[in-house]
Amino acid sequence: MKPLSSPLQQYRQTVVERLPEPLAEEPLSAQAKSVLTFSDFVQDSIIAHREWLTELESQPPQADEWQHYAAWLQEALSNVSDEAGLMRELRLFRRRIMVRIAWAQTLALVTEESILQQLSYLAETLIVAARDWLYDACCREWGTPCNAQGEAQPLLILGMGKLGGGELNFSSDIDLIFAWPEHGCTQGGRRELDNAQFFTRMGQRLIKVLDQPTQDGFVYRVDMRLRPFGESGPLVLSFAALEDYYQEQGRDWERYAMVKARIMGDSEGVYANELRAMLRPFVFRRYIDFSVIQSLRNMKGMIAREVRRRGLTDNIKLGAGGIREIEFIVQVFQLIRGGREPSLQSCSLLPTLSAIAALHLLSENDAEQLRVAYLFLRRLENLLQSINDEQTQTLPSDELNRARLAWAMDFADWPQLTGALTAHMNNVRRVFNELIGDDESETQEESLSEQWRELWQDALQEDDTTPVLAHLSEDDRKQVLTLISDFRKELDKRTIGPRGRQVLDHLMPHLLSDVCAREDAAVTLSRITALLVGIVTRTTYLELLSEFPAALNHLISLCAASPMIASQLARYPLLLDELLDPNTLYQPTATDAYRDELRQYLLRVPEDDEEQQLEALRQFKQAQLLRIAAADIAGTLPVMKVSDHLTWLAEAMIDAVVQQAWVQMVARYGKPNHLNDREGRGFAVVGYGKLGGWELGYSSDLDLIFLHDCPMDAMTDGEREIDGRQFYLRLAQRIMHLFSTRTSSGILYEVDARLRPSGAAGMLVTSTEAFADYQKNEAWTWEHQALVRARVVYGDPQLTAHFDAVRREIMTLPREGRTLQTEVREMREKMRAHLGNKHRDRFDIKADEGGITDIEFITQYLVLRYAHEKPKLTRWSDNVRILELLAQNDIMEEQEAMALTRAYTTLRDELHHLALQELPGHVSGDCFTAERDLVRASWQKWLVEE
């Protein structure tokens, strides 16, 4: 054993003096002192369990002792009679074995491969033991789940990621997917459950047993987000449902994740073999599949952006040349050729790397360098995490932990360790770039004329600027020079390191040459320098613009076109990452794919880290808004499609926010017990106004109401039991909080819930029965108008159907024409008096006479007036399709409906573009006169003359 370094010898004395009396009196071996000096986790564990030290000294850890884990754990569980006892014994066993592994790892008693094997098998042993104990307990309670032939059905667990690969790190989440073979019902229980209910309840209990913190800690943090449909999907799926999903909807990233999937426990049983055979064609294609290279390149780009976004420096997992890049290199060969080469189908990295070398897909030298680098990085990662049993891959900045790692990695000091680390990561980066790096070789841009450099460096006299700024007017030329001078003065106030200055000096001549070639150079430069002031201390973003000329070009184009985009980029520089790929920048996410994109995005954030989850939601929204706006500016999205995208994005956000709020509420109170015998959550979110009508703008707020179908006598089933209706009230309050909380990326959306029954004075969440009663007996006409543009944007099918039925019933009530006409007209006149434009020479596109609101009132009036005779008028909630229905049902002439539609879309298009220019929603009084005359005539016809 290598002696402790000088700093650690001094610290060792502090450790020994800090030990409580019984331990301090015992003679400690040199090995024990070394391990206690290295790991606070081991130190705390030994203090709590002195007998473990005796065991370690008398029976030191062995490389093959993982073979005894199952027997040792069975002995520990032999007297367990309830779930609380199970949780306690699992946690103690995990901690005891982790101390043994940390001891062996610190003293290098076993190889790093052995450490990875022990960590993975320990997790598998604990998961399987917990599953088997709970399966027996659940069968006693509910009967045994069987298929149609009466054969017992097991719960199979897929270990994903490093757990599946047998490469778990010291302090790690575990990614799991639950499945059962065939449908059927329980037999022999007090009451019959179908298999889906049985395994869902059992799965929930298994997660709680492993994941829930107690006074003994937790076993593992369990992450179930890799399952089909993520958090919104069923917790457990049948084999048939799994197969359907992966055949019909499986994404590329799910295919990569499935490479490392491994069945926990009995992996050779009939059902295990069936599941494995079912998944194999999805993962390993029969043909050689080169498309994966670009997909993996895209994934790596996403990770690189995440590293920048979260400010991750010195990260040995995600950084350039880190563990993730080695995994990507190996996966490229598995996914391209795995279908034809069985030796590449291993879920473990090192055996696959050997197979890659044997097939001559990589040179022996490259394969060996990757193997050595991988083991070096994994040892460093595990040692780092074993100091405090903490999930981190970021190198320490304090001297003590640096000294600990240098000693344990067998280096004299920290600089020697980081030197070796850099060499390994450079080797990995080289192979990665050759294989997965950008497919376009970086070419040196032609050097710019010396005058652009001099312009930036303030070396040109004003008289000398004529050649480079000749096309600009004298005023614009002076303004450009003033902007450059002011920007340089602003830089002098900032702390910018040598690297930042160097990057700026390379970037600015390029930027100036591009901006100053434009007629609108002064305006564009003013927007871009405002943005640059915000990021000059963050060299990473300057490097992004300097190293990717295309990103710089997109930045200039977008800032020139829209001050709104320039402001967004200045406020949230992480959006600059979106400029890297024009294929996605000007091509927004498919309208039906926002939920899936968001699910992938959130997978990179710890599920239990609310702050990061809130930040990620806001960052995703801003990135998507940028892409929609870029496509809008480029003319690739017409106005209707802009609103469609903004609406689908909002719905994806609502879905994710409800999911987060639900998970938090259920963790605190359990679920309302009326949900025990049914699917879903008994909850719905109804969108009104622009959201309900598919007409959102860039800065629209969300008009929402919340519904539930919870009976009066329902209670939650958690340890902190509360009234079921109180649960839904707190759920709605939590949703409002998640939307409105201001993070560094701002709020998510402004939410207005005042359209609920009785407005601001009413309950925040309403039962479906109370909502129906209010609409029938108390609601005003304007509330029925609002219902025309309402639809469920999140909710169970039965609540959605109930709301739709109530909406249809209310809208199809017979109404006296004159009375309705008067009430609608008077409401519009009140609104105009309150909200209309006070400047006669300006036209408020939305609120003034002849504007958008008049068109909306016309459609609402006609639906309420004629839906009793023509129930089909209730089908849609957006104005354009309502106008189509009015024409199809012979209420409005087709020519008038088409003209109103054109006027409506023209006015909305102008509102979108005013928003992009950060201008208010009004224009000169002589604009849109034809559209306004048309709307006035229609208003006169329907709401005055009849």
From Swiss-Prot:
Its cofactor is Mg(2+). GO terms for molecular function: [glutamate-ammonia-ligase] adenylyltransferase activity; [glutamine synthetase]-adenylyl-L-tyrosine phosphorylase activity; ATP binding; magnesium ion binding. One of its GO terms (cellular component) is cytosol. Its EC number is 2.7.7.89, 2.7.7.42. This is Bifunctional glutamine synthetase adenylyltransferase/adenylyl-removing enzyme. Residues 449-946 are annotated as: Adenylyl transferase. One of its GO terms (biological process) is regulation of glutamine family amino acid metabolic process. PANTHER family: BIFUNCTIONAL GLUTAMINE SYNTHETASE ADENYLYLTRANSFERASE_ADENYLYL-REMOVING ENZYME, GLUTAMINE SYNTHETASE ADENYLYLTRANSFERASE. It catalyses: [glutamine synthetase]-O(4)-(5'-adenylyl)-L-tyrosine + phosphate = [glutamine synthetase]-L-tyrosine + ADP; [glutamine synthetase]-L-tyrosine + ATP = [glutamine synthetase]-O(4)-(5'-adenylyl)-L-tyrosine + diphosphate. CDD domains: NT_GlnE_GlnD_like. It comes from Shigella sonnei (strain Ss046). InterPro entries: GlnE, GlnE_rpt_dom, NT_sf, PII_UdlTrfase/GS_AdlTrfase. Residues 1-440 are annotated as: Adenylyl removase. Belongs to the GlnE family. It is an enzyme of class 2 (transferase). Involved in the regulation of glutamine synthetase GlnA, a key enzyme in the process to assimilate ammonia. When cellular nitrogen levels are high, the C-terminal adenylyl transferase (AT) inactivates GlnA by covalent transfer of an adenylyl group from ATP to specific tyrosine residue of GlnA, thus reducing its activity. Conversely, when nitrogen levels are low, the N-terminal adenylyl removase (AR) activates GlnA by removing the adenylyl group by phosphorolysis, increasing its activity. SUPFAM superfamilies: Nucleotidyltransferase, Nucleotidyltransferase substrate binding subunit/domain. Keywords: ATP-binding, Magnesium, Multifunctional enzyme, Nucleotide-binding, Nucleotidyltransferase, Transferase.
